[in-house]
Amino acid sequence: MHRQLCLLTLGLLLLAGSGCGRRQQVSPAPADSPIRIVVTNHYTAPMEVVAVGSNISHRLGIVHPGMVGEFVLPQAMVGGGTVELFAVDGASRARSGPLLLSPGVVVDFAIRNPLYNSTASVRP
């Protein structure tokens, strides 16, 4: 009984360890790779999307309800700290919060109803 338990434990450890193989190295994106902003508007009104970073405010465009807008962030806005996205509808606005971006990443900005439920995530 003790031997079977030891063999079972050893087998499980070998199985778990085989999943820890070497990962392929991913090289960083070139410094001139664009940063894409993908905005999905789940809100009930058209939203104007603005990016603010490095003391620059840049209007990206308008995304209508139920639509997806894809934009490219100007290179001058990257590297000097964080970037924040805002979606504005008159007096109401959604914000992404500060995002630390690097060349080649994609930002998914989901505008939700109510606006304080909006989210942003960064992916490679």
Which stretches of residues belong to each language-model region?
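Extracellular beta-sheet/turn segments enriched in Thr/Pro/Gly and aliphatic residues
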Residues: 21-28, 93-124
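Short amphipathic beta-strand segments in non-cytosolic proteins
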Residues: 50-57
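Short beta-strand/loop motifs in extracellular/secreted proteins, especially
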Residues: 45-49, 81-83
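Asparagine-centered strand-capping/turn motif at beta-strand->loop junctions
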Residues: 39-43
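Bacterial N-terminal signal peptides that target proteins for export
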Residues: 1-8
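C-terminal motif of bacterial Sec signal peptides marking the signal peptidase cleavage site
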Residues: 15-19
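A short, solvent-exposed beta-strand micro-motif common in secreted/extracellular proteins
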Residues: 78-90
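Exposed aromatic-hydrophobic patches
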Residues: 68-76
